[in-house]
Amino acid sequence: MSTECLKPQTGGPQSQSLSQGGQYGALASGTCLPPSTPVPWSLPRWRAYLAAAVLCYINLLNYMNWFIIPGVLLDVQKYFHISDSHAGLLQTVFISCLLVSAPVFGYLGDRYNRKAILSFGILLWSGAGLSSSFISYQYSWLFFLSRGFVGTGAASYSTIAPTVLGDLFVKDQRTCALAVFYIFIPVGSGLGYVLGSTVAELTGNWRWALRLMPCLDAMALALLILLVPDVPRGAAEKQGEVAVRAPRSSWCEDVRYLGRNWSFVFSTLGVTAIAFVTGALGFWAPKFLFEARVVHGLQLPCFQEQCHSQDSLIFGALTVATGIIGVMLGAEASRRYKKVNPRAEPLICASSLFATAPCLYLALILASRTLLASYVFLALGELLLSCNWAVVADILLSVVVPRCRGTAEALQITVAHVLGDAGSPYLTGLISSVLQAERPDSYLQHFLSLQHSFLCCAFAIVLGGGFFLLTALHLEKDQARARQPGKGTLDSKDIASRNTESQGLLSGTSTPTE
């Protein structure tokens, strides 16, 4: 920002009148006027709530796009003539592109217009989804590629949208907003299954499910452009103050800063443990429950290529119901407990994970004796796991400086997927296969092998609880640092030198350099 300095005027009534008038006297004396003060940034509450509602709606569509293909997976396999192993690659391609893209969007989201990046992501995933519905069966590789583009678009939204919410609200309002936002993860996942299978059944063509989603995406894009403001980073924490651009740092400086932020590091490891368990449960739990029914004599063994079972539907309904209740329960407990204990958030996460471990263990052990008890404890375990989603997002936003939150979200997503749900289904299946190789070939032994392989999830969830206890030890210190003006990824010397330079420019003087 530049200032203009006028030369002093001598003589004449005009110069005398100027010198008598305060500000005009400064002009007459030849001193520099400070630049005009920027208008403080503020946003009415109703605009913030409206923007949050739009972001929640888009999050619903985001996860519907994630799980619409699994809802019509059998039809996709028949159309493209692909086996189960190749069908599994659809999700692998999706997750891989999401993992590669998340750090890129995190970097861009910390430095450029987040609203434009979100719009690009919606256009990308809706365009890829629509175009995939017109691909001929001879070009199945194009269909796989399109799922990769959908994953890339989803990465932009999953990385940046929570940071926008974090800049719209603070404290209890932020916790409630994040709770509502993360409710749409299980709801969107379940609706993706329902929409895909229902539209395919009504129209007789699975591709119409992919053609319907872009209509909803177009509405979401219009709402985003019209109703969601371009919020300055850290705006909620500085409501009513002048929004000053912070010194820009490199991506390596951001990562180095996050690596020294122990609350972020330990909470990310805790989230990874949660992702490990949810990934294994989501993939193997329906089959485990199906084999439990076979052992109890309630279900005939599957001798056909397509097995008809209600276990997937029941498990999906449990996931949606427990997800909604769990997210709201965790957010409300965090909001109330924070009033008496500043370390409430990681302590709630740790206690819920420690309580999940025995529930999961009992659900596995009791499945061979009573299926009803297994369902009850499995539902309790999923409920306790869901209590963490909004709380861990609130932890991240409270311990990371605003200009680095996009990178933090991206790194947390990447680590949680790479070390969590990307490998846990394979590891669980590998342990089950190794155990089956050493046992007689029977339905009972198949069930017991999968049952024993699930025990690694109980261990992982206890480990995650320990990481959240470590988070509690550092939480207050990291929150205080994130609230301090000028703190961030740059070293203190760099910040001091840049502040000195800016003050020199404003005062019309320069600082000598060696």
UniProtKB/Swiss-Prot annotation:
Subcellular location: Membrane
Keywords: Lipid transport, Membrane, Transmembrane, Transmembrane helix, Transport
Regions that span the bilayer: 54-74, 88-108, 116-136, 149-169, 176-196, 212-232, 264-284, 313-333, 347-367, 376-396, 415-435, 453-473
InterPro entries: MFS, MFS_dom, MFS_spinster-like, MFS_trans_sf
One GO term (biological process): lipid transport
A GO-annotated cellular component: membrane
Keyword Magnesium: no
GO terms of molecular function: transmembrane transporter activity
Biased composition (Polar residues): 497-514
Segments of this protein annotated with the region Disordered: 1-22, 482-514
Disulfide bond sites: none
Membrane protein topology class: Multi-pass membrane protein
Signal peptide: none
Pfam family of the protein (one): MFS_1
Compositional bias segments (type: Low complexity): 9-21
Function: Sphingolipid transporter.
Similarity annotation: Belongs to the major facilitator superfamily. Spinster (TC 2.A.1.49) family.
Protein name: Protein spinster homolog 3
Organism: Mus musculus (Mouse)
Gene encoding the protein: Spns3
